[in-house]
Amino acid sequence: MTQVPLLALLLALPLWQGTLLAQNAQEPTRDAPLAPAPVGQVFDRFAALQHTDGELVGAGIDYRARFSANGAQFTPALGETAPVEFPVTLRGVAYGRGGAEQALPAGEPTYRERTVSYLRGTVEEIYEVRPEGLKQSFVFHERPAGRGDLIVAVQVATQLALQTQNGDAVTFGNEFGGVRIDAVLGIDALGRTCKGSLSFAGDQLQLRLPAAFVDAAALPLVLDPMLGAVIPTNATGRNLDPQVAYDADLGKYLVVWWRRLSANTGDIYGQFVNRETTGGADLSGGSVVIRSGSNSQRARVADCSVRNAFVVAWQDVVTVTPLPTHRDLHVRAVTPTVLGTTFPLAISSADEQGLEMASNATESSSDLLTLWIQAGYVYQTTITVSASLACGRTAVYSSTSISGITAVRISRSGGVANRNLVAYLTSGGDIMTRLLDGVIQSNSTQTWYGVRPYTSLALDGDGENWFLAATMLEVGSTTLNDIVGMTFGWRQAGNLHVRQNATTLVANPGVQDHRPTVAMSGRNAVLAWTQGSTTQHLGLRTFGQSLCAPCEDPIAVFTGASGQQVVACLAAQASGRESGATRDDALLVWQGDNGTASALQAQRWTPADGIATQVAPGCGGLTATAVAECANHQGSSHLALLRNAPVGATSWLLIGFERRDATGCGPCVLVPELSTSFVFGPTATDAYRNASWSIPIAGGSQVIGLSYYQQWLVQDTATPGCPAFQFDLSNALQVTIQ
């Protein structure tokens, strides 16, 4: 190994900047920062069908469908203004030429993918679950005998009144909305089509095709009407409280939410979203009905990596006299192909609510830490997931000794050893934090008092570092908020978490900044938040997880209509066990809710916070790790970090643009060319076993795509990787500026 007196090679920042600007980017366009990329109309294509809790259930954008021997029940999502559900049940009962005289026998439904079939003798009654409604078909494999028009009689059962009918459509409804049946079409085996008609009398809908088309049709002959929901402008069948998680092995996100069907019913739905590399241009990955038939609300989702599954939890509003109205908690495992059984997580006459779950990204455990609020106290347990995707839980116990907790948050990315940080918001506006590991051992609770009351919070972490964003009342205001940030680190000695920094993240005087959500993107944290009151905007920005410093300029992702409430959630691919080097993006999901409609939208986001690729492992007994933060061309916050070295260890940082891979001192490989490298040091690691250097990046967009090599030397007199010089080497990184 080349011998150079390291202490003589102290770096001057102007020299670093000059050398940086003299480099040539090998592929500057490849690593340019990307604007937010839309996912596409994923939620506009929501359509699901599967067995759920013993029922064959389907759903589209604005309806639910159930299928049984009694027929197909179509329920429009009319929202909380409707006191009850108003379904329409359809069943083909007879057919014939010139009149419906031939009875259609009863039958049980069968299904494949999103199509339900009833075999009724030689006639097949089919329902295709589509996003916009049910497509009903009658398939004739034999030409019906006789003369005259082909008529199919469909029995209709509903509390809705007949509102309109003509030869093209029939509408059933009331003041809350209704159902429309229209678009009768005949199709033969050669693809020839003929427009039909329909009429309603008594309790029967008659579908009709002209005799001439029936006589000449190539078999099989299909008669196709279409069922869709009629949702008035004042309906409130909203999609609410979305949350998203990511699984690396599946290569998919799962977005969950709940839909209000009536004042006392709500369903839980899910939409898989492919990561870009597995889904191509079409990112929709399948839809699922997770819970149906109760008053289910506030869905939550977490990843269970070892099972290649997601765990979805929700709260059911229960009204059973003489018990008071309260909320119970339920959970089930979900994959793209399997829906696990529902497990009652917390069932009592008490009101359990505000549930949150942490993902488990390890491959050694299927335990997911779970917390909720009951009577102002926080309770916690561990959800277990078996190989058959059956959920269970361990004992439930109180996580706090004080009452008055109004919100609880837990880091959702899983992280190292299933180690998680929990944060509680008190009624007095303080934040309390506690460290939990995979077996629910915890350290003491710490309380953080703001200069003004905190009003909400969001949290994520990787098991060693955590990023917390909280809203705090603006100076002189009782309603407007700013957003502040705190970072926390894990100190192995004593199994403690310690706050490393607190700073303002978003502050616009006189403007409401609120509803933060956070996801770890590997080395950094992505923050999304809502800005504004009457007209609300959705902002997005990447921050370093060490000092809460911004890595890049904020992005305005979405602007809502006047009066629309914008609420977002985030998950990054790094949260599903992928590293910062392999993750491609994060998924941002939000609802735009105006009180009468609440559409879900999503956008893909690739943080331009630099690309760090390990090119050589470390050596020696200290196992210190090199990390790069905010390697962005706007990089005034660019940091080179050393983590997990002993407290007080002397270290030097080497940065070079040329690669040497020098060997000859034990197993160590010194990657940067030492003779042309810049050296920062010496410095000592802090009480949290970390060291860092701030290395600003100047030059603007002309430095995008430039790469340099980063490696640390750490003094080690006990087990040195390089005995001749008594030091260890950290892993070496190739860092590319974005």
Where are these regions (language model features)?
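Solvent-exposed residues in well-ordered beta-strands and their adjoining turns
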Residues: S68, V139-R143, Q155-Q159, P210-A212, ...
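Acidic glycine-/aspartate-rich tracts in secreted/extracellular proteins
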Residues: G79-E80, R143-A145, A157-L160, D215, ...
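Residues that cap or anchor secondary-structure elements
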Residues: Q23-G228
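N-proximal, solvent-exposed segments at the start of the mature chain
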Residues: T606-Q738
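Hydrophobic residues positioned within well-ordered beta-strands of beta-sheet architectures
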Residues: V116, Q136, L150-V152, G196, ...
